[in-house]
């Protein structure tokens, strides 16, 4: 698929998005941090693990609304029970995705068409599952895209296959700041050679709890500063 004439909202040739998984309590600090720099992201939620009351790991639906949705971020499907579609029988995979989408839409009153594959995603297949089958039932369930877990693409192009969307980089990628510099330094004008006019997307992914485990929230701060230009 060729995107030479595609532009992001406002006619912009470049955009930044963040995709973070599991709906854990660290998402509150993560959301507050990225919002401070004017960045937005997608929080991929397991509907079966939404907390009914405050606990140490998961957010409640009320907290998701307050700290994610009401601050201009969005939520997406991450499976009801965090099971890899590639390891489930198709009927189980369908149920896991559908139940998650229905529950999230009921809780938050919005249409949800995005997804990030949970666990090993489509990296490994068992129980008669295969990628073509997974892709087709996601389409039938109204899912418009699915972020993959097959590694980083180390680039900024939009996907050729929206159901195997490989992001630019995990936040712990050793080249993360070199990628940010390359992205920031790219200039696209009317004089840019026609084959180089495709839009660029910086697509960062991970889990917010990783910053707590590594005690490196300052790493997120530096990423946000460089991507936003706000210090």
Q: Which sequence ranges carry the predicted segments?
A:
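Catalytic domains of cell-wall/extracellular-matrix polysaccharide-remodeling enzymes
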Residues: 84-187, 219
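Non-cysteine beta-strand/loop elements that form the S-adenosyl-L-methionine
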Residues: 74-78, 146-148
């Amino acid at each position: 698929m060729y995107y030479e004439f595609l532009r992001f909202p406002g006619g912009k040739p470049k955009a930044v998005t963040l995709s973070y998984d599991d709906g854990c309590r660290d998402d509150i600090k993560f959301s507050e941090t990225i919002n401070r720099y004017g960045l937005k992201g997608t929080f991929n939620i397991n509907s079966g693990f939404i907390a009914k009351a405050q606990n140490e790991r998961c957010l409640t639906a009320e907290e998701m609304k307050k700290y994610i949705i009401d601050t201009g971020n969005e939520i997406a499907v991450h499976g009801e029970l965090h099971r890899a579609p590639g390891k489930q029988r198709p009927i189980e995979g369908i149920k896991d995705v559908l139940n998650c989408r229905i529950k999230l839409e009921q809780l938050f009153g919005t249409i949800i068409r995005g997804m990030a594959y949970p666990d090993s995603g489509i990296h490994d297949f068992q129980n008669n599952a295969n990628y073509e089958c997974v892709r087709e039932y996601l389409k039938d369930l109204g899912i418009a895209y699915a972020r993959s877990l097959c590694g980083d693409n180390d680039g900024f192009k939009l996907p050729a296959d929206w159901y195997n969307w490989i992001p630019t980089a995990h936040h712990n990628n050793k080249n993360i700041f070199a990628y940010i510099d390359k992205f920031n330094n790219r200039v696209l004008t009317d004089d840019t050679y026609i084959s180089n006019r495709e839009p660029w997307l910086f697509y960062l992914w991970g889990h917010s709890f990783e910053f707590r485990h590594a005690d490196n929230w300052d790493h997120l701060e530096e990423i946000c500063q460089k991507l936003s230009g706000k210090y």
